[in-house]
C-alpha cells in the first residue's frame, strides 16, 4: 500500500493544482484593467516570458508605469527597440554606443518613490525649451552639419565639420529673448506693464542675472501709472515719448520731465508714478529691476485700490487704521478704501487727480484730463536744468545722449554712461547704460566686453545678431541634459565654436555675456539700449577695424603661429579696413587680392589646407563670423 498512490489522492492533487493555477491567474496584474495604454502594452509583452518568476516580476514592474502616461520603458530590459509607438513628434532610436544600462528614456522617479510626471519646476523649464530637437538626436558618429547662415541663401557654405563651428538659430539661441517671452502683469485699454521671464530659467549660464528683471511699460497719451512702490531697485529709460516721473520718500518729492534717452533711478521703497504728458504719442519705458528681498522676484505695493491690485491699506485691521489716521473707520474707508466716495468726493473733485469713476477705474493705468496733466507737470524739472539739485543724489536723472558719443562715424554712434563718481546713480549698483544707433545697412564690428554682462533691449528697427560662444561638444544629448552639465568642466573634453544667430525686432531682448564676441547688422535703422552688469573697469574690445583692434596688437611672431597666413599677411589684411567700430555691411569687392600675383595661388592653397583644422581657438572664433 505504501508504494501505491491512491486514485483518490491523485484526484485531490489535480484539484489542488487547478485551484492554485486559477488563483494565480486571478491575481495576475495582466488581468487588471488600466487606462494607460503604455502600461497595458507592457503587461502584454510580459506574457512572452517563458519563465513564470520572470513573468511575475515583469508584471509587477508594469503596474508602476500606470502613473506615467508618457512611459516608453521596457521592464524586461530588452536592448532592442520595442513594439510601442512613440508619442507624436518623437523619434525612436536603438541603443547607441555609450548608453547606460539603465535606459535614460525611463520615466523620472519622484521623491516618494512612485513613477510620475515631472514636477512644476521641470514642467516650466520643459515648456520654455519646447523647440525642435533634431540637432541633438543626431547619432554620435555623425559630424556637425555644415553651416548656412540664416537668411543668406546663395552664399558659400562655411563652418565645415573640420572647422568645429556650429550654428544655432533663433529657436535654439539661449541668448535671445523674443518679445513674446514677456508676460503682462497689469493691462487695460490705457496701456500695460510687462515683465520678461527670468534669465536663469532660460539657461543656467545666466545665474549671475538671477536678480535682474526687465520690465516694459506702455501707456497711451494723457494717462497715469498710479503711485506705487516696489521691493526692488529700478532704473528706467524712456524709449519713446515724453513722461513726467515723480519720485517721493517720507521727506521729499521730486518730479522730472523726461524725454527719449533720459534715465532715472527709483530706489527700493520709493513711491513713484509716471505720467504720459503727450497728447498724441504713446509712451514706452524700459526698466531693469533688482529685487532686494527674494532673488528674481519683486512685488508692487499700491496705496490705492484698482481692478488689478488692492490697496495695501486694506491689509491692516480697523483698530490699526483708526489709530494711525486718528479718524473713524467709516471716514477712512470712504476716503481711502472705497471707490465711490459720494457727495464729498464730488465737492472736492476739482482738486483730485480724477473722479476715478467706473469708466476709467479699470486698472493701474488711468486716463487723466488736460487740467490734471498741467497740475502734475507744474513743478517738474527738465533734465537739462538741474539747478538746485544736490550733487551726488542717486535720484538725479541721466541723459544718455549728453555730450559727444563715445564711438561715432557715418555708420553709427555709441553713447555710454559708466559707474563712476560722476554718476552715483550707477556706481553702487556697478552698472552702465549704453545707447547704440546703427544706420541701415551698417554693421557694428565684431567685439566683446572684457568684464560686463550686457542685457540689450531692441528699442527701434530690425537687424541680425551673431554671437559666438565656445562650448563643450554635446552631440546626441537632449537640451535638458546639456543644460544640467553646462557648469561641469571635464578635463580634455573637446570644445567647439558655436554661432548663435537671431533676427532682431522692436521689443526683443538679448544678452551679451562677458568675453563673448558679438556682431550686429542693421537691416533698418537700429536703436539698442543696454544695461551692463559688473561694469566697473570694463573695456570694449574690437576684433576688426582701424582702431581699438586687439588682433592688431598681437605680435607678428605670435600671428605667424596662430593664423594660417603669415604675420605680414595678417597685418596687411587688417589694414584693408579703414573704418572703425561701425562699417558698411556690404563686403568690399574681391577683385583686388591682398597678396602679390606671383604668390596668390600657393597662398590660397596653403590657406585652404590650414582652414580644415585651424591653428587655434582664435581662428575658430573669427571663422564663426564668416
From Swiss-Prot:
The lineage of its organism: Eukaryota, Viridiplantae, Streptophyta, Embryophyta, Tracheophyta. Glycans are attached at residue 521. Belongs to the 7S seed storage protein family. This is Allergen Ara h 1, clone P41B. Residues 482-491 have a biased composition (Acidic residues). InterPro entries: Cupin_1, RmlC-like_jellyroll, RmlC_Cupin_sf, Seed_Storage-Functional. Residues 175-333, 398-571 form the Cupin type-1 domain. The keyword Glycoprotein applies. GO terms for molecular function: IgE binding. Residues 1-25 form the signal peptide. Residues 70-183, 377-405, 472-496, 577-626 are annotated as: Disordered.
Amino acid at each position: 500500500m505504501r508504494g501505491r498512490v491512491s486514485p483518490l489522492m491523485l484526484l485531490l492533487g489535480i484539484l489542488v493544482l487547478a485551484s492554485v493555477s486559477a488563483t494565480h491567474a486571478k491575481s495576475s496584474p495582466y488581468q487588471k484593467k488600466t487606462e494607460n495604454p503604455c502600461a497595458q502594452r507592457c503587461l502584454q509583452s510580459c506574457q512572452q516570458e517563458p519563465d513564470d518568476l520572470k513573468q511575475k516580476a515583469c508584471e509587477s514592474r508594469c503596474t508602476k508605469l500606470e502613473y506615467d502616461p508618457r512611459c516608453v520603458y521596457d521592464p524586461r530590459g530588452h536592448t532592442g527597440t520595442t513594439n510601442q509607438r512613440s508619442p507624436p513628434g518623437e523619434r525612436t532610436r536603438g541603443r547607441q554606443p555609450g548608453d547606460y544600462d539603465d535606459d535614460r528614456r525611463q520615466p523620472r522617479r519622484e521623491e516618494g518613490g512612485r513613477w510620475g510626471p515631472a514636477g512644476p519646476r521641470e514642467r516650466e523649464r520643459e515648456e520654455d525649451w519646447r523647440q525642435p530637437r533634431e540637432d541633438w538626436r543626431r547619432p554620435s558618429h555623425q559630424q556637425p552639419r555644415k553651416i548656412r547662415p540664416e537668411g543668406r541663401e546663395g552664399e558659400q557654405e562655411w563652418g565645415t565639420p573640420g572647422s568645429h563651428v556650429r550654428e544655432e538659430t533663433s529657436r535654439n539661441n539661449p541668448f535671445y529673448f523674443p518679445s513674446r517671452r514677456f508676460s503682462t502683469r497689469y493691462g487695460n485699454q490705457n496701456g500695460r506693464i510687462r515683465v520678461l521671464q527670468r534669465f536663469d530659467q532660460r539657461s543656467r549660464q545666466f545665474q549671475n542675472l538671477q536678480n535682474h528683471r526687465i520690465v516694459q511699460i506702455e501707456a497711451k497719451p494723457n494717462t497715469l501709472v498710479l503711485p506705487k512702490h516696489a521691493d526692488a531697485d529700478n532704473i528706467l529709460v524712456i524709449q519713446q515719448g515724453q513722461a513726467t516721473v515723480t519720485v517721493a520718500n517720507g521727506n521729499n518729492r521730486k518730479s522730472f520731465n523726461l524725454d527719449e534717452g533720459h534715465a532715472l533711478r527709483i530706489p527700493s521703497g520709493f513711491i513713484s508714478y509716471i505720467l504720459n504728458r503727450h497728447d498724441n504719442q504713446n509712451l514706452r519705458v524700459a526698466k531693469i529691476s533688482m529685487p532686494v528681498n527674494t532673488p528674481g522676484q519683486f512685488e508692487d505695493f499700491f496705496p490705492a485700490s484698482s481692478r488689478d491690485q488692492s490697496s495695501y491699506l486694506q491689509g491692516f485691521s480697523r483698530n490699526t487704521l483708526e489709530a494711525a489716521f486718528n479718524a473713524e473707520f467709516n471716514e477712512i474707508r470712504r476716503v481711502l478704501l472705497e471707490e465711490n466716495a459720494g457727495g464729498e468726493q464730488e465737492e472736492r473733485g476739482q482738486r483730485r487727480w480724477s473722479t476715478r469713476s467706473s469708466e476709467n477705474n479699470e486698472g493701474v493705468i488711468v486716463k487723466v484730463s488736460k487740467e490734471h496733466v498741467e497740475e502734475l507737470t507744474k513743478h517738474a524739472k527738465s533734465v537739462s536744468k538741474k539747478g538746485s539739485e544736490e550733487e551726488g543724489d542717486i535720484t538725479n536723472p541721466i541723459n544718455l545722449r549728453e555730450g559727444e558719443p563715445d564711438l561715432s562715424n557715418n555708420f553709427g554712434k555709441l553713447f555710454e554712461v559708466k559707474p563712476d563718481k560722476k554718476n552715483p546713480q550707477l556706481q553702487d549698483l556697478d552698472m552702465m547704460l549704453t545707447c547704440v544707433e546703427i544706420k541701415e545697412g551698417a554693421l557694428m564690428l565684431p567685439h566683446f566686453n572684457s568684464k560686463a554682462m550686457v542685457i540689450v533691449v531692441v528699442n527701434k528697427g530690425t537687424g541680425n545678431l551673431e554671437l559666438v560662444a565656445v562650448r563643450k561638444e554635446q552631440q546626441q544629448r537632449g537640451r535638458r541634459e546639456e543644460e544640467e552639465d553646462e557648469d561641469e568642466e571635464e578635463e580634455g573634453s573637446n570644445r567647439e565654436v558655436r554661432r548663435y544667430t537671431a533676427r532682431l525686432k522692436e521689443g526683443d531682448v538679448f544678452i551679451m555675456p562677458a568675453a563673448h564676441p558679438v556682431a550686429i547688422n542693421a537691416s533698418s535703422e537700429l536703436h539698442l539700449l543696454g544695461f551692463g552688469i559688473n561694469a566697473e573697469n570694463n573695456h570694449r574690445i574690437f576684433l576688426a577695424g582701424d582702431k581699438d583692434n586687439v588682433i592688431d596688437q598681437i605680435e607678428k611672431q605670435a600671428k605667424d603661429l596662430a593664423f594660417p597666413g603669415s604675420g605680414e599677411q595678417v597685418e596687411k589684411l587688417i589694414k584693408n579696413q579703414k573704418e572703425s567700430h561701425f562699417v558698411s555691411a556690404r563686403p568690399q569687392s574681391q577683385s583686388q587680392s591682398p597678396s602679390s600675383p606671383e604668390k596668390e595661388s600657393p597662398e590660397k592653397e596653403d590657406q585652404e589646407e590650414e582652414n580644415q583644422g585651424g591653428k587655434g581657438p582664435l581662428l575658430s572664433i573669427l571663422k564663426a563670423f564668416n
